[in-house]
C-alpha cells in the first residue's frame, strides 16, 4: 500500500574502484608486476539495504553486501559475505544478527588513513598465524578475514546510543560446533568522539584451529587476542591519526606476539586530500620488523567520483617478507628481508 511504501525503503548501492598498479619485488624471485587492480581506495561492492518504520521509535533494517572486482568483472561466485544482517534500532541503540565487520574492527580501523584498502593500508589485521608467526607452512581453519578478526559469522552485535560522545559496541560470534569452540568470536570497543577529538579502545578474541605443516601433520588450538588503541585529532589545517595494536597468539604450547603501530597525517588540498602514513610491524616470533610508509592523494571530481594515487614502500628486515596489498594484481611477499615498492593510480565511483 501507499502507507506501507512511505514507511519503508530499499536502496541499491555500490562502489566500483579500479586502478593501474605496479609492484616491484612482487615475489621471492624479485620479479615485478603491473596491470589493473581493484579496490585501491575503497572496496568495490554491490549491495541492498532497507529500513522499515515499525512505530513507537522502533525501526527494522537489513543489509546485504558482496564484493565485486572492477578490474575483471569477476565475483568469485557472488555472495553476501561482506555483510548479511538483520537489525532492530531504537532509543536503546541497535541489535544486529548475521555476518559483518566485528564491532571493534569497524571502529578502530577507521583510524587507518588508507581505509584498509590498497597498497597503503595498515596491515595490523593481517592473518599472521598463516604467514610468518608459526611458519609459512601453517594455515588457520577459517577464512583470512575471520582469522584476522575483521569479520565474524553467526554474530549477535549490539551498538549503544551516543552518551555525550561515548559509544560502545559488543559482538559474539557462535562457533556452532558440537565439540570444541573453533570459530567462536567475542569482542568489543569503547569510544569517545567530541569535536576534533576521537579515541577508541577495542579487544577481540578468536578461537581457531592451526593446521601444522605441509601436508598437514597435526593441528593445535589457536587463540588470537587483539588489543587496539586508536585516535585522531583534527586541527583543521591537518588531521593526526594513530593506531597501537598487539595481536597475541597462543598455540603449540607457546605464546607469540605481533606489535603493530601506525602514525599518519592528512591535509585538505582544494577538492582533495593528501595523506602520509608510517607503520611498523614487529613480528616477535621471527624477531623481525617491517617499516611501511605510504603517500597518497585523493581528488574529488564530485560527491560520488574521485581519482587517486598512492605510492607505498615496505622495508622488510631480517626474516620479514610482508607484501603490499594490491588486490587482484599477482603479488606476494618478497624474499625475506627484501623491500617492495608499489604504485596505484585509479578511479573510484559510488552509486
Predicted feature residues:
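Outer-membrane beta-barrel "beta-signal"
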Residues: 335-351
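Outer membrane beta-barrel
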Residues: 7-22, 33-175, 182-184, 191-198
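Outer-envelope beta-barrel architecture signal
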Residues: 8-14, 52, 56-60, 91-95, ...
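Detector for outer-membrane/organellar transmembrane beta-barrel domains
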Residues: 187-300, 310-313
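Structural signature of outer-membrane beta-barrel domains
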Residues: 19-23, 67-71, 102-106, 175-177, ...
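Sec/Tat signal peptide C-region and signal peptidase I cleavage site
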Residues: 2-6
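Transmembrane beta-strands of outer-membrane beta-barrel proteins
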Residues: 13-21, 63-65, 98-100, 169-173, ...
Amino acid at each position: 500500500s501507499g502507507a506501507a511504501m512511505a514507511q519503508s525503503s530499499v536502496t541499491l548501492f555500490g562502489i566500483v574502484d579500479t586502478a593501474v598498479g605496479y609492484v616491484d619485488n612482487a615475489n621471492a624471485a624479485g620479479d615485478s608486476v603491473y596491470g589493473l587492480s581493484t579496490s585501491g581506495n575503497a572496496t568495490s561492492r554491490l549491495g541492498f539495504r532497507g529500513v522499515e518504520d515499525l512505530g513507537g521509535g522502533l525501526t527494522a533494517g537489513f543489509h546485504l553486501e558482496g564484493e565485486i572486482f572492477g578490474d575483471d568483472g569477476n565475483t568469485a561466485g557472488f555472495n553476501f559475505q561482506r555483510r548479511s544482517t538483520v537489525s532492530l534500532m531504537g532509543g536503546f541503540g541497535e541489535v544486529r544478527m548475521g555476518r559483518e565487520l566485528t564491532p571493534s574492527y569497524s571502529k578502530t580501523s577507521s583510524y587507518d588513513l588508507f581505509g584498509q584498502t590498497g597498497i597503503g593500508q595498515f596491515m595490523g589485521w593481517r592473518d599472521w598465524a598463516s604467514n610468518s608467526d608459526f611458519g609459512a607452512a601453517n594455515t588457520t581453519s577459517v577464512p583470512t578475514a575471520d582469522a584476522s578478526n575483521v569479520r565474524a559469522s553467526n554474530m549477535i552485535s549490539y551498538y549503544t546510543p551516543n552518551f555525550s560522545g561515548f559509544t560502545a559496541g559488543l559482538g559474539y560470534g557462535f562457533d556452532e560446533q558440537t565439540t570444541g569452540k573453533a570459530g567462536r568470536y567475542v569482542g568489543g570497543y569503547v569510544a569517545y568522539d567530541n569535536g576534533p577529538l576521537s579515541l577508541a579502545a577495542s579487544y577481540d578474541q578468536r578461537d581457531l584451529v592451526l593446521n601444522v605443516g605441509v601436508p598437514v601433520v597435526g593441528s593445535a588450538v589457536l587463540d588470537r587476542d587483539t588489543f587496539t588503541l586508536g585516535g585522531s585529532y583534527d586541527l583543521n589545517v591537518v588531521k593526526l591519526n594513530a593506531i597501537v595494536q598487539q595481536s597475541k597468539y597462543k598455540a603449540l604450547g607457546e605464546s607469540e606476539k605481533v606489535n603493530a603501530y601506525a602514525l599518519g597525517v592528512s591535509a585538505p588540498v582544494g577538492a582533495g586530500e593528501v595523506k602520509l602514513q608510517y607503520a611498523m610491524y614487529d613480528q616477535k616470533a621471527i624477531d623481525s620488523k617491517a617499516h611501511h610508509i605510504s603517500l597518497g592523494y585523493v581528488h574529488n571530481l564530485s560527491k560520488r567520483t574521485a581519482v587517486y594515487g598512492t605510492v607505498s614502500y615496505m622495508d622488510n628486515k631480517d626474516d620479514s617478507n610482508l607484501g603490499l596489498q594490491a588486490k587482484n594484481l599477482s603479488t606476494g611477499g618478497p624474499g625475506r628481508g627484501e623491500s617492495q615498492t608499489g604504485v596505484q593510480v585509479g578511479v573510484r565511483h559510488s552509486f
